[in-house]
């Protein structure tokens, strides 16, 4: 499912006014930029057939950076507003002048898109994620009667960023991140051992919630647990 767009210049600030302010702030600096970020994350943990935790978090803010010679000044705030930006500007203006200003060329405009603009958090309904974790638990217990405990977790996050420079160059990026972990404990003759497996990356949640993928994680976690159970002291 597509990512809900983070639009700092439509939601919080006037773009032209902000660009003018940035140029004024950095007029005596060698380099610098204005950075906006919004991040949302969700995690669910099922432990021993019970949903133990479910967390949803979100944050946003901006950072203003100026470089002059070997000195760097940085100001940031979780409040994206003109008032907060002006306060940050006052901090940046305290940067001592290095005398001769040397202009730094901006990064290349040729950028390779690495991630799809997706939001893995809203890709699946909350109830479907809970059902998935329960299915993982049931599947693990059905593989081996020695399984006494299963812990499964799924996490997803998305980071939206905007970078504004003084040359009117405006860049944005979306960075999704997903993770699925499985931990299995087996017990035999009073001895208990645990094995874990999982995977994730900057891609859609569906790539790791596919049965062929998560079953592989379960089997690997079980293999490690059984291997530990059968291990003998050196």
Language model: regions and residue ranges:
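Active-site bordering "gate/hinge" segments
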Residues: 1-234
